[in-house]
Regions:
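A cross-family phosphate/adenosyl-ligand binding-site feature
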Residues: 1-135, 143-207
Length: 207
């Protein structure tokens, strides 16, 4: 099976904070990006708990649902199952330029740090690291244990960007959406995707 080329892979795990991932996907679609998407089964449970979405369980149905929900073009979002080893993200020759794991469980963090490739999500992260592409991990856990911190340090030394979803309040957010946008804006900055979610610090965009 042939797939459309995409520059970004977005993986969602079963950590709380799935709104960050859904908002990020919306922004990537709005920016015209093609996106590979991997959603773990625990992430599907979290989506059901934290949102009103009725996400189907089959990857093809999930892909159509997200395409319709986010008003994306056909083929702009491509969803892969955890055992879909023919997906481009499973090989260095088809690796995207960047991958974001958002939110990222500490279990997934551990597997990536140790080079495990037990499913497509872990393999995709392994490929991105070995190909020297950009890997952004958004670990949603509190507090972090020594093991968590050791894994983060190990991954940071490999070149991964560790980005806990810690919002800033100096711009005085008024809604939950404002807080979500702060985190998503920082992810987009590291993906070199232009956005208007937040003003740039110290820059007058009206001048």
């Amino acid at each position: 099976m042939k797939y459309k080329s995409a520059n970004i892979c977005l993986a969602m795990t079963g950590a709380s904070g799935i709104q960050y991932a859904l908002r990020l996907l919306q922004c990537l679609v709005d920016a015209g990006e093609n996106v590979y998407v991997i959603i773990s089964q625990p992430a599907q449970i979290v989506i059901d708990m934290e949102t009103d979405l009725q996400l189907p369980s089959r990857p093809n149905d999930m892909q159509q649902y997200l395409t319709d929900y986010l008003n994306a073009k056909e083929g702009q979002i491509q969803v892969f199952g955890k055992d879909q080893w023919t997906a481009p993200v499973a090989s260095g020759s088809g690796a995207p330029n960047a991958m974001v794991v958002c939110p990222c469980t500490t279990g997934t963090l551990s597997s990536i740090a140790c080079g495990s490739s037990n499913n497509l999500m872990e393999r995709a992260a392994d490929v991105v690291l070995k190909e020297r592409k950009k890997l952004i991990l958004v670990p949603r856990e509190m507090p972090f244990s020594e093991i968590h911190l050791e894994h983060m340090l190990k991954l940071a030394r490999m070149g991964a960007v560790i980005m806990p979803p810690n919002p800033g309040f100096y711009y005085r957010p008024k809604t939950i959406e404002d807080i979500i946008d702060f985190v998503v804006a920082r992810i987009l900055d590291h993906l070199d995707i232009k956005h208007e979610l937040l003003p740039q610090w110290g820059i007058d965009n009206n001048s």
